[in-house]
Amino acid sequence: MRSDISLDEMAAELSRLADLSTAVPLPESEVVALEEVIGAPLPDEFRSFLLRFGRGVRPGPLLDLHWIVEETQQEREDFQEEPEVAAYPWEPFPVTRDDVRQLRRLAAEEADPTLWMDKPSPGTMFLCSHGCSWISMLAMNGEYAGTVWLTEMGWVKDMSWWPSAPWRDVEPSSRLHGGWSEPVPFLDWYTRWTRQIVSRHWRSRQPDFS
């Protein structure tokens, strides 16, 4: 699934929103090393982002690649202890169009637009932490490859999944979805979140005349 925004369009927008000098592109060798840790090729948009912008640009979100590696390695160790819940990035990502239609129905009914799974989702990799055990995961393959999903890593029996939408600025206690039901590809996800962060910073600097 491709983003509405292209990498060049994203660069143009980020040059207006953020400081592109803070972007440090990753060399190909480091991207390959990350893929070796993950055990699967990175989705095209995410891979291109790393090669062009590295971890990201300030004041937008910065990806913590060391955290991604550490969480991946720790999860592999956990799976050795609990093989019945093991799920790996190279396995098929299970979310289908029917699942997404279900999310839309739930949102229309003002219910939580979440998908229940009894274990971590195969076909995903760690992307970023939102604090505590709230984690955005990147779909690695399938028709929703490159989209970003949120879960609560409470290890591990009752896990729900939903499209990650951190730009909605909802507290973790509200499950960070705020009714959002549409899968969002990585470039769109990063751009929307950066817009929200920049807007919030701008509002915080405005004088209060009340």
Describe these PLM feature segments.
Residues 1-128:
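A surface-exposed partner-binding patch
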Residues 3, 7, 92-96, 176-191:
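Intrinsic-disorder-associated interaction segments
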Residues 57-59, 63, 145, 149, ...:
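Polar low-complexity intrinsically disordered regions enriched in Ser/Thr and small residues
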Residues 59, 64-74, 162, 166, ...:
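Helix N-cap / beta->alpha transition motif
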Residues 134-177:
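Segments surrounding the PLD/"HKD" phosphodiesterase catalytic module and close analogs
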Residues 178-210:
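Low-complexity, Gly/Ser/Thr/Pro-rich intrinsically disordered linker/tail segments
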